[in-house]
């Protein structure tokens, strides 16, 4: 599982010009699910996302987590995080899990996040979405449950 985590002052996502998810201060999280992902991968990324110390404390040091600040989450599925561009000019998405299996894992990931009692908003799985992100910092972290980076 891969996640692109961005610290935001606000973020929203639209489907067909309708806002389907919107948050204030917190994290915008783009999620990619691979063919090999399991529940353990979901838990690993969930724990990293809610516990990353990327919010500033009173000394302006990145020392606080999303849980510490009681921030909000906007989670958006993005299979293109598994695009392989090493050959040719068009990305290959062979490693991305597709269809219903990916949707089930995505929904399980959302359930795990909601256990943290944080506000969790989402996009619409598989839809064409327009995402507005007001980066804070900017601070952007890339996570990979198979620890490739």
Curated annotation (Swiss-Prot):
<comment type="similarity">
    <text>Belongs to the DTD family.</text>
</comment>
<dbReference type="GO" id="GO:0106026">
    <property type="term" value="F:Gly-tRNA(Ala) deacylase activity"/>
</dbReference>
<dbReference type="GO" id="GO:0043908">
    <property type="term" value="F:Ser(Gly)-tRNA(Ala) hydrolase activity"/>
</dbReference>
<dbReference type="GO" id="GO:0051500">
    <property type="term" value="F:D-tyrosyl-tRNA(Tyr) deacylase activity"/>
</dbReference>
<dbReference type="Pfam" id="PF02580">
    <property type="entry name" value="Tyr_Deacylase"/>
</dbReference>
<keyword id="KW-0820">tRNA-binding</keyword>
<comment type="subunit">
    <text>Homodimer.</text>
</comment>
<keyword id="KW-0694">RNA-binding</keyword>
<feature type="short sequence motif" description="Gly-cisPro motif, important for rejection of L-amino acids">
    <location>
        <begin position="137"/>
        <end position="138"/>
    </location>
</feature>
<keyword id="KW-0963">Cytoplasm</keyword>
<dbReference type="InterPro" id="IPR003732">
    <property type="entry name" value="Daa-tRNA_deacyls_DTD"/>
</dbReference>
<dbReference type="GO" id="GO:0005737">
    <property type="term" value="C:cytoplasm"/>
</dbReference>
<dbReference type="GO" id="GO:0000049">
    <property type="term" value="F:tRNA binding"/>
</dbReference>
<dbReference type="InterPro" id="IPR023509">
    <property type="entry name" value="DTD-like_sf"/>
</dbReference>
<keyword id="KW-0378">Hydrolase</keyword>
<dbReference type="GO" id="GO:0019478">
    <property type="term" value="P:D-amino acid catabolic process"/>
</dbReference>
<protein>
    <recommendedName>
        <fullName>D-aminoacyl-tRNA deacylase</fullName>
        <ecNumber>3.1.1.96</ecNumber>
    </recommendedName>
</protein>
<comment type="function">
    <text>An aminoacyl-tRNA editing enzyme that deacylates mischarged D-aminoacyl-tRNAs. Also deacylates mischarged glycyl-tRNA(Ala), protecting cells against glycine mischarging by AlaRS. Acts via tRNA-based rather than protein-based catalysis; rejects L-amino acids rather than detecting D-amino acids in the active site. By recycling D-aminoacyl-tRNA to D-amino acids and free tRNA molecules, this enzyme counteracts the toxicity associated with the formation of D-aminoacyl-tRNA entities in vivo and helps enforce protein L-homochirality.</text>
</comment>
């Amino acid at each position: 599982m891969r996640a692109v985590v961005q610290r935001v002052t606000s973020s929203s996502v639209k489907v067909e010009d309708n806002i389907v998810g919107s948050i204030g201060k917190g994290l915008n999280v783009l999620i990619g699910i691979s063919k090999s992902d399991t529940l353990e991968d979901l838990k690993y990324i969930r724990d990293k996302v809610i516990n990353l110390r990327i919010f500033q404390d009173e000394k302006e040091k990145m020392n606080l987590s999303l849980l510490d600040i009681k921030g909000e989450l906007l989670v958006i599925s993005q299979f293109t995080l598994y695009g392989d561009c090493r050959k040719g000019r068009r990305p290959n998405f062979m490693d991305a899990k597709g269809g219903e299996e990916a949707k089930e894992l995505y929904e399980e990931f959302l359930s795990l996040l909601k256990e943290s009692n944080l506000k969790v908003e989402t996009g619409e799985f598989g839809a064409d979405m327009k995402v507005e992100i007001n980066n804070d910092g900017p601070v952007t972290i890339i996570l990979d449950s198979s620890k490739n980076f």
